[in-house]
């Protein structure tokens, strides 16, 4: 426990409208923890194809080396296109509110509907807009991540990340899917 970290996490949580939050050592660590606490070898995730390059590499390469597959879809994919990307072993959907550096905007509501229709959580990286400009939980996200190094820090002097849980996803309702 670190009271300073706890205070910052609580502030970010309140700004996002979440139920709980934690800080990480970086934004990449936040995305890593959010994904790897849900998916494991043999699992699959669906992700927006337009995301920060480091996160794309995490999902497309590092996760694949660890036995987790991914299907990428456009950030404005239709519900039908999203549904086609799911597999029986899909564990999560990932996207970025506003992609860095492409500035493509994620259709959070459609991604949330697809994720929830398939019984999996939607994870949204909200680094670019921060909760000052967009609160993904209000649009259906279950988990929100941040690189606090970017806009929250102001100019990259401090490295950090955050994970916010909306507190609404019913993990127990999915049976053995999320032990």
What are these regions (language model features)?
Residues 21-179:
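Conserved PLP-enzyme active-site core in the AAT-like
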């Amino acid at each position: 426990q670190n009271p300073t970290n706890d205070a910052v996490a609580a502030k970010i949580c309140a700004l996002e409208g979440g139920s709980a939050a934690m800080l990480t050592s970086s934004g990449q660590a936040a995305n890593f923890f959010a994904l790897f606490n849900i998916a494991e070898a043999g699992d699959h995730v669906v992700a927006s194809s337009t995301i920060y390059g480091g996160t794309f590499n995490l999902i497309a390469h590092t996760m694949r080396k660890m036995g987790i597959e991914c299907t990428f879809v456009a950030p404005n994919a239709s519900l039908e296109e999203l549904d086609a990307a799911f597999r029986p072993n899909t564990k999560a959907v990932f996207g970025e509110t506003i992609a860095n550096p492409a500035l493509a905007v994620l259709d959070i509501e459609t991604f949330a509907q697809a994720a929830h229709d398939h019984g999996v959580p939607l994870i949204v990286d909200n680094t670019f807009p921060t909760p000052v400009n967009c609160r993904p939980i209000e649009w259906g996200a279950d988990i929100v991540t941040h690189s606090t190094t970017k806009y929250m820090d102001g100019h990259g002097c401090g490295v950090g990340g955050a994970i916010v849980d909306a507190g609404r996803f019913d993990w127990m309702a999915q049976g053995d899917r999320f032990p």
